[in-house]
Structure formats: C-alpha cells, structure tokens
Amino acid sequence: MSEQLSIADARQAEAIGRQVVLQGWVRTRRDSKAGFSFLELNDGSCFGNIQVIASADLENYEQEIKKLSAGCSVSVVGLVKESPGKGQTTEIEATAVTVHGLADTETYPLQKKRHSFEFLRTIAHLRPRTNTFGAIARVRNCICNSIHQFFQEDGFLYIHTPVITTSDCEGAGEMFQVTTLELDKVPKTEAKVDFTQDFFDRPAYLTVSGQLEAEIFACGLGKVYTFGPTFRAENSNTARHLAEFWMVEPEMAFYDLEDNMRVAERMLKRIFRDVLEKCPEDMEFFNLRIDKTVIETLEKIIDADFVRLPYTEAVDILTASGEKFEFPVDWGTDLQSEHERYLTEKHFQCPVILYDYPRQIKPFYMRVNDDGHTVRAMDVLVPKVGEIIGGSQREERLDVLQQRMKEQNLEPEGYWWYLDLRRYGTVPHSGFGLGLERVLQFVTGMANIRDVIPFPRTPGTAEF
Amino acid sequence: MSEQLSIADARQAEAIGRQVVLQGWVRTRRDSKAGFSFLELNDGSCFGNIQVIASADLENYEQEIKKLSAGCSVSVVGLVKESPGKGQTTEIEATAVTVHGLADTETYPLQKKRHSFEFLRTIAHLRPRTNTFGAIARVRNCICNSIHQFFQEDGFLYIHTPVITTSDCEGAGEMFQVTTLELDKVPKTEAKVDFTQDFFDRPAYLTVSGQLEAEIFACGLGKVYTFGPTFRAENSNTARHLAEFWMVEPEMAFYDLEDNMRVAERMLKRIFRDVLEKCPEDMEFFNLRIDKTVIETLEKIIDADFVRLPYTEAVDILTASGEKFEFPVDWGTDLQSEHERYLTEKHFQCPVILYDYPRQIKPFYMRVNDDGHTVRAMDVLVPKVGEIIGGSQREERLDVLQQRMKEQNLEPEGYWWYLDLRRYGTVPHSGFGLGLERVLQFVTGMANIRDVIPFPRTPGTAEF
C-alpha cells in the first residue's frame, strides 16, 4: 500500500524508492512530446513544488490529466525517484492521478502572471495559494510557535486576557464599541443611551491591550504572557496600521527594566534564529523577490548585542549629528521614525533599546525614576521598521501611581482593581508588547502590513 | 552569589545545598517559640509552597518579618536544605528577607478561610493568588501548549482568523455588533442606519467561529488550525455559557470524516495525557477538592478507544434503553444532554463519537451523505460534559452546497468567496471545533465555566 506523505517529506532524498500518495494543487502543467506530462504540485507543506511525471498510459490521461491547469486539485499515487533535474532532489512517477476539482482557466482569478499585492487583497480567499502568501503563512506560523516555545521553556504561563473590556489601558486610544443594542432604535433615558439594556449593562469596547489584566496574573503567579488580538479604531490608512492585529505581552513579577530588556532581546533573537533555521526556503524567496537585505539583517541582529541608550543621550546624539531631520529633536517630545532610523541604521547600525523617556509623554503606569522627570520606559528599535517593542517597568508604589493618574486626569474608580495590586503585596514588575505583524513585516520585508495578516481589517474593509 | 530560582525548582532534591534567591507571596506565617518563624511561600511556578525558616537573628525580624501575613510579597535569600518535615523535600533557611509589599490583614479580601467561588469572581484580580485559581491557570496553560504542540508536530499551520467579521458562520447565532458610531446619535438615511459612516462602511460583528476562513487556508495550504477568541451574544446565564470564549478549530484538506475523528480522538488523548504528566500536583488538588473522579476519568479515556456510533443507531439504543428521559428521543431531533450522558456514562462508559446526523438539524456546510437524509457531522461526547467537540466533513460539491444554502434561506452573495473554494480546485476536507473552557471544565471538574477563564464575560458582567 502507498503511504500518505507531505510534499515537504517527498522532496527529501530519504523518500526515494517509496510508494506514496501525494495530495495538493497543480501549479503548472507542461506536456512533453515524448508521451507524458509534467505537473508541478504544491500542498502548502513547503515552499517548493514536487514534479509529477504523468504518462500518457494513465487511463485518464487524455480526458482529465491533459486538462489540468493552475489551481486544480489532485491525488497522485506513485513512486518517488531521484530527479535528474536541477534544483530538485526527487520527483514522482505517477501510477494514478485522481482529479478532485478543476479550475477553469477562463475564470480562475490566479493566472500564471504575477499579480499585484493590491489585486490579491481583493481575493484574499485565494491568495494563500500563491508563493508569496504561502510563504507568509508558514513564516507567521513559525514565529508564533517560536514565541510560545520561548516563553514556555522559560516557565511563563500563557494567559488569555479579555477582548471585550470596559476599561481603557492607555487612557486614550480610539476604541470600537461592542453592543447588542439595535442601532436604529437605541434606547434612551433622558437623552442618554440606556446601557442597562445593553448586553453588559454598560458601555463595552474591544481591548487595545491586555497589559493591565496581565499585571493581575503576574502579581500572583510570577511570569505570564498574553498572545491575542487587539484593536484600534484609528482612521489610519497606512501600510503600518491595522484595526485588528495580534499582540504578545509578557509581564514578569520581580523584573526590573534591565531584566525586561534582556527578555525582549532574547525573544527577538530567538524568533529570528528560528525563522532562518526552520523556513530557509521561504526566507530565500523573500530575500530574492521582496527585499534583498532581509536575511543579512536578521543574521547580523542575531549576533549583535543590542545597544542600550537613555532617551536623553539619544537626543544628544541626534542633536549633534548634523543630520537634516524633517522634525526637530527636542527633549520632552517623542522621537519620530526618522530619528529612530538614524540611530539604528546610521549611528549604531544595530538594534537599539531606548529607555528612560520623559515622564510627560508616557502612560501613567510607567515607573517614575528618582530624577522625577523620566520614567522607566523602553522602546526596542530595529533598522527600517523603527519601534518594534514598547515596554516599561510598572509603577508599583501606590501613592506615586495615584499621583500619576491624577496628572493624567484618570478616574481612579475605573482602576480600583489595578490599584489593589499595589495595595496588597505589591512587587516590582515589568513587561512589554510586541506587535506580531510588525515583526512579520520586518522578517519578510513585506511593505504593507495588510499582506502579513490573513484577513486585514482597515477603515472600510472587513471582507472575508 | 545567590542564584535566582523558581519555587518549583527549589522544591526539588537537586536544589539542596544551593544558595538561592526566591521571590513570591507569603501564604501563611507561623512563629515558633524557639526564636524563628516559618513562612509558606508561593510564586505561581507550582502548586506547592516552600517553607522558609526566618530566624529572629535577621535584622528586620521584629519590624518586618513578624508583620508578614497572607498576600505579602518578599524576596528571600538563603540556603536550600533537606526538609525534615513530611510532604516536602526541601526548605530554605533565610539569610535575608526583603519585604516588597504588605497586605493589611484588616482589608485584604483573601482571608485564610475558604471563600466561595461566587465571592472570588467579584475579586477576579486577586483570585489567581488562591490555590484553586493558580492551579487552573497552570492547567489552562498546559492544555494550550499541548494543543499547539499536537498540531505543530503534525505539520499544521497556526492561522489567525479575524475577530471582526461581516459574515455569520452558522447562518444564525446571536452576534455582538462592533461599531464606531456614537450610540446617542446614530446617523440615519431614510430611517435606516447610515453604515457608510461606520468604521467598516457596513455592519460588522464579533465572530462566532473561524471555520469558514480556516477552510480558505486549508483549501490551499492543507492542514491548518485556529486558536482564538469567539463570541456569542446569547442571554444565557448558565454554568456552561460565556459570551467570550476560546476555541480551537483545525481544518484539513483531503481528510474525510473518519480522518477527522482520528484527529479529534488523538488530540483529546494528547491533552489529557499532558495534563496528568505535567500538572500532577494541580490535578491531585482538583481530584481531592473539586471532583474525586477527574484523574480516574482521564486515565480511562487515555486508554480506551472512542466508540463510533451513527446517530440513527444511537436513537435505536436510546429508544430500546427503557430509560426514563425528560425529553423524548425522536429521529430527526437533536439529542439532549441526558441522552448524550446515557450513552457515554451508562451504555458505553467511554467517549462516543456520534456521526451522520439528520440533514435538517445541521448547518449548510456539512457534506450530504448518499442517503440524502443525513450529513457527515460528528459530535464527540464525553462523560459528565456531553458534547466536547463538534465537527464535520465539509460539502465540497458546488451544486450540493448551493442547494443546501437555498434550503436554509442563505443569500449566496455573502458567501461568494466560500463558494469559490468549491469552484476552483475543490477538495474533500474536514474539521472540528473544540471549546477550550469546556475541556478545562472536564479536566478540572470545575462546575462553573466562569471559573476556568481569567475574566469571564457574561450578561451584565465585563468587569476587569
């Protein structure tokens, strides 16, 4: 009997001589005058195809096999042989080809020619069948797995923080509202929406971050991380913004900012190393077709120590650089992308962890330094992308935290439980957030963030 | 220098003789007349505590150590020694105890006495610090990790299907609406809501299932799984319903219903085996305090073959059983929980996979059998919980699928891309859904689903 094999396995030398069943989708068909056809078959298990040799002797050769075109689905039974061809180790000599589904060449939207990414977004249900989007799916899977393994091996607990929330982590942030009220007849009492008739008896939103809830678990169970979807209702139509994206947020009790930096650096290096090791074919494709620097960039980062630089020194470096920036550099304002890129690409030529930012530009939960002017914030900057991680040591002192909330006009009532964490058994703790899609953009070189998530949600777009 | 160690590691015999730093929260303090105090310390790394012996010679003994109570946070430096006490391998002789945060015994809500789970839900920010909820967090983490490993080892790709959606997988289902319109002044044109002013230019909802999108990826990349939050806006105040819960949905190209059953059975056994192996202390606790049958039940399932039983035969068995059921058994209606429990608990005394359900009670996407009356649906039933997995082979034939949609009054326009999967290179494929919280209830014996998710969302409740 023939054994079921993935094409990834069938392409290895070890498969030679085995009688197998392969199942997948035809990429191309080429007919030889010598009385057989070559099918390039892909099943998603790897970037490369396997070549199937289908002889004219097969009973359905004329009626079916010769009609196969890009997108058709087949099962192939046959013998794996050493391939005489270049760039492939094996090929399969078919003894049977079963056709499951055809794909009419007149109407099938994926033609042989190269399609623009813009066009492919309109057929997001078919784009996983292309080389580029198959590769993105595998690299995305690899990175997710790498993240989980990194934390699991280090004793972190994976926790699920809620998507539906009634609190707002950043104190600002544009949020989506979640409701079961009928929008064409919203109930009101005294001209105000009557939320007692809504599902949760109060206004509810989609979370912008699981950090505050992750702190709950860290402040009782030590080391935890979240990995889930987060949301921004910003009307940003850029290549770097999504309304729905995935975020990883580790949070560690008894970790200070230096510990936090070490976790962030180790995690990024682990991700990059895994991608290069486990997806070499996919990465070669990105390096060849999308951005000729991606592999070299990742390799350099894996070997380099990240620079640690206080914000204040960064401002000094930028001021003294003689560089012409569009935006002025001024202590007390956020750095712009051009400044971040100057630091990582020109000045240091490696990732930089900026820390100790001005108090007034950072959220209330970041720990205030003894100088009173700065807080224990950190941003990890990488070449080309800029900020890829943002984090901080959290303010664990109840009185200082309350003072900071007052400064930022936050109502303590909504944060009673967050304050309780400081009231009972408070501990120094730290954490950060990593946007999965930003990492994917960095790793693959893909210019538009809409192309590294299966089904992008952006203003006006929620198809599929 | 002392090395940082988790309490899980410090409790092992290998730690004896090492100079360590432990950090965590005090569970209890007991003072000996012999001039020292015993602290039970927990850091979340495992169920058990470590006993810290703090001598009166320590400089902060009177001022600080003797004030320690449940919930206080400390760092302890000391030597790990063999413990003369029963039920513990090691203990630590402190050379320094640093107090990070006290927890006023007058106001700290977690007192020594046992609290009801209802009460603990009102302090969900503190309940991870209890034995029960620490154990749940570790078992939940273990199960999530087990699920990822199971699929990763088998070549599945983890994919993220969207939370915000404009389609409704089940064709029915009560959904939450997602909007950026201001509810107190919803814009209207001709008495209808003007969705062109909403974020996505149309009504958008929270997903009830990622299945249809998972099918997209399976029908191009082979074997995939989703693992993410899903939502139901049902007004169900039961111990088994949540408005927000996590679901795992594998989807496999070229898999028929029998293949699907095999994946489901293997996955459940893998989860149960991992939990028993990796969380033995936590499971002993559940077995002792929550449900005295959980360990035995899991062990039996791991060793048993799941029974496969067509729905029609199940109806025959139930009808012939002589059992008095509250609801009548009738071919063509859904089985009730009492029927499912009779089959798994009394008749077979093991998990049962029911399959080939009546066409009229199942969704449009399930493959129609040759008999015309049944579809290739399957439900995995386990003792006590009943249905834990629901799945099916999907209808891959375009014409049959279109006919089924017509039967169920579904508009094909909304499903153009789903139909395209059958139009171009269609393949037999199958998948199922597993509710994470149901599994957790089954594994731990916890009666209420609100206690196995960090922050439950239910009608009227979205605190934290």
Residue map of PLM features:
Chain A
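Class II aminoacyl-tRNA synthetase-like tRNA-binding/catalytic domains
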Residues: 2-249, 253
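A translation/RNA-centric and nucleic-acid-associated enzymatic feature enriched
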Residues: 164, 174-273, 284-464
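Residue-level recognition of alpha-helix termini/interfacial anchor residues
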Residues: 61, 278-282
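Generic non-transmembrane alpha-helical segments
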Residues: 146-154, 267-278
